[in-house]
Structure formats: C-alpha cells, structure tokens
Amino acid sequence: EINRKLTRDQKSIYRGMHGKHSTPKNIPTKESVELFWKGIWEQKSNFNKESTWLQELQAKYCHQAQQTKYRVSPEVLDKVTTKLQNNKAPGPDLLTGYWYKRLSFYRNHLATIFDECLNGDAEIPDWLIAARTKLIPKNSDAHLPNNYRPIACQNIMCKLYTGCLNTFLQDHCQSNQIVTHEQAAGKRGHWGCIDQLLINKMIQDEVISKRRDLACVWLDYQKAFDSVPHDWLIESLRLAKVHPQLVQAIHALTKNWTTRLSIDGSDQKMESDLIHYNKGVLQGDSLSVLLFVLAVNPLSFLLKQRKGYFMGSANERNLDITHLFFVDDLKLYSSNIDQMTHLLDVVTTFSKDIGMEFGQSKCSYMIAKRGKIVEAKDPLEVNGLRIYPLGLNDNYRYLGIDEALSYNGPLNKGKVATEYYKRVRKIWSSELSAYNKMIAHNSFAIPVLVYTFGVLTWSISELDEIDVKTRKLLTLTGNLHRNGDVDRIYMPRSEGGRGLKSVRTAFDIRLISLRQHIIQASDANPFMRKVHQHEGSGVIRIAEELLTSLDLNADPAIAPLECCKSAVKVIHKKRESSFISKVMHGYLAREMRKKPEIDFKTSLSCWSNRKMSSHFEGYIQAIQEQEIGTKYLIRKRLIQSGKEANIDDKCRLCRKHTEDVSHVIAGCERMATRFYLPLRHDEVARFLWNRLRKTHHAEGAFENNEYLCEQKEFIDTCESREYWWNIPVKTCTKVKHNRPDIIVWDHKAKTCFILEVACPLDVNVSLKETEKENIYGQLIRNMQMMYTEYTFTFAPIIVGASGYVTSNLKQHLNNVGFETKSIPSIIRQIQVLAISGTVKIAKTFMKFKS
C-alpha cells in the first residue's frame, strides 16, 4: 500500500516520515474553523488611497506600459500543461495533472475558452474557481484552528487558466524589470533563497573581515498571504503598467475566489461550508505568489530610495543595499541605527497603509560595530512596532539558516546532519521497496544537505564521514551487505547499481551548478556581481577545480543543468570503471561485458522493478560480488590477513569442489534436484506456462498453478490447444532428450511451440542456449517427420542465476506467441523469479552446517 501511495502522493508519505504533519487526533470543530478563517478572509479591507508614498510610486515606478493584447494560444497552453505535476493533490474535481497531460485533443478548444475569459467575452464558471483548501497542522496542538496552514488545491482547469495568466504577467515583469533585484521570488532564472543567502553571506563576511558597522532587522509578516487587500492587488498591477486586459481578467478571478476547508483527522474528518475570499491570495497557486510579490514590490522600490549599507572596500563603496526580500521574509540593512529607524518608518507606514501587520514575537534586530556584535537591551520602537534585540548568544533563523552576525556553521551543520540521518533511518526502515527507498533517499533525505552546500563551508572529510555513516545505517537496517561494494551503491540502476546519490557527489554537482548560476546571474544583478567577486576564492574556485579534475568544459555560458548532467555522467563512468576493475566484486560485471551476445541493457532492467525488497536486493548484489560467507571466501580472507588458513574449502555438501559462490548457486550436484529445480527453474517455467495461457485467453489461466506445482507431468486442454507440462514425447527413433519443459499444441492453427527453461551461471548463459538448441534438435526433427502438417518452433528460455540474458531471448519469446509490447515486462518478471530463487538457494545452503 505504501509503495502504491508513493507513486500517487509522495508529499504525504514524506510528511508522515518527517513526523511534523502527522494525522491529528483531536481536530477543531467545524464551527470554530469557520469562525476563525471567515474572520480572516471574509472581512474585507482596503488600502489607504491617500498615502503619501503612492504619488511617488505613480511618478517613478514603471514607465513602460504593455501595448499588445495577450492571447491564449494552444502553444501557450501546451507550455503550461507540461509544468503540471502528475499526482499533485487535486481540487474539487478530484482530477490530477496526469490525465490532462495525456489528453491532447481538448487543448485547442480549451485555449479558445480561456482566451474568451481573458478578453471578457465569457464569464469564468464558479465551479472552475472554487478551491479545496487542506488545513495542515503546524504543530502537535491541533485542536486550535489557528495552528493550521491552509494549502489551496484548485481544479486542474483553474490551474491551467491561472498558469496562462501567470505566464503573461511574468513576461511583462521580466521585459520591464518590474521586480527589484532585492526580491528573489517570482522571477525566472533566480535561485530564490540561495541567491539571498549568498548575498547575505557576502555582507556578513565583509562586515567581519573589514570591521565594518552594521545594523540589521529581521521582520516577519503575520499571515501575509491572507492579509493583502484585493483592491491593492489590482492597484499594484496598474502601477506596474500591466495591460488592462490582464488586470481585468485577474480582477474577475480574485473577486470570485471561494473555498471549502477540510481537515483529515485520524478518527474523523471535517469539511466547512463555502468561504469567500474578500482579501488575501491562495497558498499553493503559482499566480498568487507573483501577485503577492507585486503587492509588496513597491515597498522594495521605496526602500531603494533610502540609504542603507554600502558594500565594497573603502574606495569603492558604490553599491547600496537596504534590504533583501524573499516573498514575505524581509531583512533590512543599514550602517547605523539612525538609518535603520528611517527604513523601519518606510516599512511600517507602507505595511499599515495596505493593511498588513507584523508578528512582533518573530521580529528582531542586531547591531555590530567594527565587525563585532554590540549588546543591545532596549527594544526598537517605530510607529507602534516594537522589536527586541537579538541576544549575544542567540541566533535568528533566516531562510532556514541560523545566523547572527554570521552563519553559525557548527550549529547549522549539526542540525541538517541530524535531520538527514533521521530521514535516512525512516526511509530505510520503512516498508518501501528497494526502488522506492532509493527515490525517497535521493529526493527526501539528500536535499536537506544540498540546501546548505555553497552557503555553509563543508570540508571533504565531513562529507565523506556522512557518506560512511549513511552506509552503516543501511547495513544496520539490513539493506546493504556489510562488505557490499561502495562504488556500486552509487552507480545508476541502469548500470547495475543501487542508484543512491552520494553526499560527496551531490556537493560537487551543487558547486558546479552554483558556479554557472553565479556567473550568469552577475550579468544582470549587481548584487550577484559582488557575490561573483566575493566567491572567486570560494565556491567558484572549488567548482573550477572540480571541472578540471573531471575534464569538463568550464565555459560559463553553459546552462547549470547541462553542466550538471555532463558532470554526473563523468562521475558515474568513473565509478563504473572502478567497480569493474575490482578483482572479486567486479568479476561478474567484467566478464559479462566481454560477451557480445549478452543483452546488457535488458539484463539490468530487472533493477527497475518497483516491488523488489531492499533486503533481497542487497543480498543478490552480495552474491554477484562473491561476498556471502562461503568457505572459499573465509579461507581467502584468512590468507589476506596473514593468518594460518588451515580451513578446508571443499563444498560442505558434495565434498568434491571448492565452495565458492558459483558452486553454491548453480554447481552443486547435491543441490540440483532438491533446490535448483523447484526454487528457480520450476518457478520460471510455471510463470511462462501461465502467461502463455493468459496470452491465448484461456479461462482460468492461473487456476492450476498450485496443482501444477505438485505434478511431475501434466496436460491441460483449452479449446483447440493442449498445454503439456514436462511430458515426454514419443518418437519413431530413440531420442535421449525428449522431455522439454513446456509444449503448446494448437491443433487449429497447426502449430507447436516447445519451450525449454534453464537458469545456469550467468557466464554460461550463451553456452547453455547453444547447448539446448543442439540437444533438442534431434527431437524437433523427429517430431517434424511424425507430424508433417504442423509447424514447430523451439524456444530456449535461458536466464542467468542473477538475471543476465542473451539478445536472442526477445526473439524466442516473440516466436512462441507473446506480444511484442509485453515481452520486456515478461523478461523482467522471469529475471526477478530467477534472482529470487538464487537468493533462496544461497540462504538455504548457508544454513547447512560446515
């Protein structure tokens, strides 16, 4: 169940693992929820139209008006549709983006309807705008309605429409540079929080290294998204000279916003009546983010007209910064407390005029003189806003990083490492399959660390230590053999690895992409230009050394994503080469790559199976790496350690051959009939028997499976077909090999399919295929002489003990009637059955006393 849910809704699985947003037990009543949220959203508010700063904005804010009307074309709609997430929580229509992305025939008609709504020729239906707002608990105190965060889930149709409007609004803002450099949200080509953290880090380093004076204030808006008046949203669009057509379309949308609140408790569920939005924007909508950014962007414009902190050396202090904005997270900078008071006066006046308030308990300020924090005891009061100073030993959490005058490296690294290990334990001790654990590890655990790379200073030894501890956790939870190959863990699954991201590799890739981004962003953003100069001996230098070591093009014009892809390919290639070159661990992979008749891509496709257990996967890879505890391995380890190797390495059962991995899984004659045949060979053969019946639409295709397991010989008849299981064929002359595994007679079509299954050692797969064709050649010739009206087809189905197959297998399966499109799936399933049998055989063998 958890594996199916992960493919549909990853976020809910991750929230459960994180433990922050678990399903609440005591949820608030419907009446209390409606009373609280109606008091916020349905209470209409207006901005102060007599504000003194409004005239300044009208004169200087934006000079270039949009002249051309917008049109929703099928091409625009296609671009918006491709950005839809497949399984994101649906709105009231309960339809996910998966279906809209695959149904293309509707788009021309839908584009026409959206264009009519944009031009005002048609009204937007109420059902399309109506949202379903999910209340997510912020903490364990879930019985209070104010302890929930509202996340709006809109109908897919509405997401497509607002996506088109967002595209047009983005185009206008970008072409006219409406959004200031200080605001990192709602802009294309920006890295949001990372850009702000890098600029902030640069200022901190300069203050400390050059012993500068600095005053800074952290401000937090109270319910920012829920407070902004709708008339100010529209006025901010007009100030930005947005085309009246687009302004009118957005106004028609916002005035009809409605939603129903819902809470999913462990014992009960709650759904409210319809609530109207008379102020605020929807959380979770792309257009709403940009609307909010444009609503607070005039504040950035006003702050830029004041004096702040001048960056640079004593002779080159020509770049002034007063603040940094990320959506509603605001940090102010100035050279002294008097300048800061002027900045706060602008902020408080603007915020009061547009009806937004600050959460005073989450605001703080700090003063530094000559590069050191000065203790302040008195609160800072401006226009009724009281801000308390940050303690000398305290930190403020800004954009996810704890800071004071500088980022607290040990504290932050300790926090993210602890959170990372917590997530790793949750993932690898869960019931997820091996493939899904890999997905969760790479997308839920690794990003915790990646967010800090380039912002905090990490040493190579710290990164390697995290990788080592990660592998230990995987071993302790039984997901990795204690002697499993390190390189193979981080190789792609398409190359036979586990597909995990290494922390060290993630660090290298992050710094390479960050270098490209900083250099490219410095062309248009003066603050990022300063970051480029500041990081010349930091992130950029390390990234250039990495590019040189990987022998990659260091051209700054290459897009960060393309540069990362090239680096990942080189790193994976190096890991693969290292793994293959290892004498014992890489033996099987090395030998199989030498054989041109092996279909390497198909042979490794079984590792993409989403149902395979991680414990099972770890054990089969240990078998392939010859790391299970055979006598041969024990004796070899004793010799390597310099101890006396007086152990007998002969097989504990047959006492004839050396007990190595190849002998255990496919070479011991004492294991052949008791274990090799029933646990592996017969499992593959039974699967093919049932799939053949299913392909032929035989009734009860799986009814005789248990009965078939107990029978040495069996014949099943369905209409004009006969299915023979292990039946000897009587011929005119004596034939030694006359008992193939499966024979399918089609008396109507006059065809006969003969299937012979074998699961030898992987290195012997091609030899076994040739051998089967030779030894059954005489039988086929005799049958052709006896049944001249029939056409005979022989198909040797050979799959190695650990899943390797030849390039002929697809053709053999096609020859006996399997549909071409189903053959890859069939091969993966017989590979898994063969591998599963090998694991059972090895574990059974190791239980026998030596």
Model-derived regions: residue spans:
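Conserved polymerase palm-domain catalytic core
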Residues: 221-343, 361, 367-368
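Basic, alpha-helical interaction scaffolds
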Residues: 384-460, 478, 513-528
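Short, conserved micro-motifs composed of acidic
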Residues: 264, 358-394
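Extended C-terminal regions of large enzymes
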Residues: 466, 479-646, 650, 831-835
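Surface-exposed loop/turn segments and immediately adjacent short secondary-structure elements
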Residues: 1-146, 156, 160, 386
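Conserved pre-motif C helix in the palm subdomain of viral-like polymerases
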Residues: 143-176, 192-198, 222-225, 276-309, ...
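Active-site metal-binding core of divalent-cation-utilizing nuclease and nuclease-like domains
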Residues: 639-645, 699-756, 770, 798
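Conserved catalytic palm subdomain of right-hand nucleotidyl-transferase polymerases, strongest
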Residues: 86-95, 133, 143-153, 194-238, ...
